[in-house]
């Protein structure tokens, strides 16, 4: 059976820390979607490991790790990340596998990603992408012109000729769209001829890989990237990523049926953050937002960009839960709220004076909503490193209890500090 870790807000909730905790007792860790446009750090002992595309289960020497079909792979970044982990002493090559059906991200995808973003920014319609080529790659995938891993690693000489033809067709279409941008396709092709041999040992039929693991009753952890509110279908479109970041992406990205899912863990930051453009109803463009940003060290791992900050939004979380069906929650960074005398939580939206029954899909409406807040007294004491739920201040427990009651989902873990072991588990 599979347990799944998913982001419930706009990303950066701290999924990696929960995955790190759960990785100690699993046999397989799988990434199902996204690319190297996300990132987190795992600390083992005194060593920090940075993950962007590769599964976090690599830190467990007994765990096999899969980059699934729904992931898009920038091969140079794949090897750079792997080599960085190995340089820090992690022996993981024999435990890392890549789906033959995953699509490839090329340098021209990254180049066109930045050109498109610059084009949009002139009209003040920038999405705020990471520039990693993720969107353009999913675009070629959807238009059925993309190139998959098996196209690259197939040892048949005809396959390499087919790869080059597909590649040049994609390059030429981008040149027609954007002109003669600074790019050397011959140089990239020469690199990929070498990657063809280097990547081949990692490649597997991921559907067969997953179903063999399930049949063998292996403990499987699926590591979601990004978060529900960035989902291509259910997020704040068009200010979203280009993949299915919810529970649906787990199934389609790994080729597994719904009945194989056991637990869905929703990771919830104790307040709300967002990177890049897009609506953010509870954003605090004031001292509150600045304090959350400073105390919470809210800067992106992948881009280094400052994260926008605001109060917890339970309207967003209720919507997120309705789609992903969380079996329990991990509330992260509760300690960031330690010094607030008063804490607010968004509990409803009003539009034109009327309370909305659900999260609005139209951004014009979303930009006009009035957030209804509930106020809580803060606990104004340091909770860093607390290991038992009962040892939390009463006001902190009241805050958490309200979240549970509102969402009707139990809280199983609470983050009480940045350290690896600053996570308490609550009986549910």
Swiss-Prot record:
Pathway: Purine metabolism; AMP biosynthesis via de novo pathway; AMP from IMP: step 1/2. One of its GO terms (molecular function) is adenylosuccinate synthase activity. Substrate binds at residues 301-307. SUPFAM superfamilies: P-loop containing nucleoside triphosphate hydrolases. It is an enzyme of class 6 (ligase). PROSITE patterns: ADENYLOSUCCIN_SYN_1 (PS01266), ADENYLOSUCCIN_SYN_2 (PS00513). This is Adenylosuccinate synthetase.
């Amino acid at each position: 059976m599979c347990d799944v870790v998913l982001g419930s807000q706009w990303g950066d909730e701290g999924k990696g820390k929960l995955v790190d905790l759960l990785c100690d007792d699993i046999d397989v860790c799988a990434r199902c979607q996204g690319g190297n446009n996300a990132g987190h750090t795992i600390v083992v002992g005194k060593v920090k490991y940075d993950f962007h595309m590769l599964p976090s289960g690599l830190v467990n020497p007994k765990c096999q790790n899969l980059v699934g079909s729904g992931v898009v792979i920038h091969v140079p970044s794949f090897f750079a990340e792997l080599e960085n982990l190995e340089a820090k002493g992690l022996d993981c090559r024999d435990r890392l596998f890549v789906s033959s059906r995953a699509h490839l991200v090329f340098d021209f995808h990254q180049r066109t990603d930045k050109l498109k973003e610059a084009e949009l920014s002139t009209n003040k319609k920038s999405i705020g992408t990471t520039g990693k080529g993720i969107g353009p790659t999913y675009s070629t995938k959807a238009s059925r012109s993309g190139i998959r891993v098996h196209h690259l690693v197939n040892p048949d000489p005809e396959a390499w000729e087919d790869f080059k033809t597909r590649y040049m067709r994609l390059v030429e279409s981008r040149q027609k769209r954007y002109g003669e941008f600074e790019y050397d396709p011959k140089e990239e092709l020469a690199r990929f001829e070498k990657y063809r041999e280097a990547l081949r040992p990692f490649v597997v039929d991921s559907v067969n890989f997953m179903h063999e693991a399930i049949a063998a009753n292996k403990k499987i952890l699926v590591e979601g990237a990004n978060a529900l509110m960035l989902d291509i279908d259910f997020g704040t479109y068009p200010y979203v990523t280009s993949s299915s970041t919810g529970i649906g992406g787990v199934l389609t990205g790994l080729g597994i049926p719904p009945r194989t899912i056991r637990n869905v863990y929703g990771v919830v930051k104790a307040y709300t953050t967002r990177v890049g453009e897009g609506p953010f109803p509870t954003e605090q463009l004031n001292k509150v937002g600045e304090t959350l940003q400073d105390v919470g060290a809210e800067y992106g791992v992948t881009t280094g960009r400052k994260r926008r900050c605001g109060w917890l939004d339970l309207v967003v979380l209720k919507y997120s839960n309705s789609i992903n069906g969380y079996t329990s929650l991990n509330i992260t960074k509760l300690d960031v709220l330690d010094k607030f005398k008063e804490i607010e939580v968004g509990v409803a939206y009003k539009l034109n004076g009327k309370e909305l029954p659900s999260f609005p899909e139209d951004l014009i409406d979303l930009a006009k909503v009035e957030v209804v807040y509930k106020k809580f007294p803060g606990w104004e004491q340091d909770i860093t490193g607390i290991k038992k739920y009962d040892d939390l201040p009463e006001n902190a427990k009241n805050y958490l209890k309200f979240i549970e009651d509102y969402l009707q989902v139990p809280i199983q873990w609470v983050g009480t500090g940045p350290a690896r072991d600053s996570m308490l588990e609550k009986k549910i």
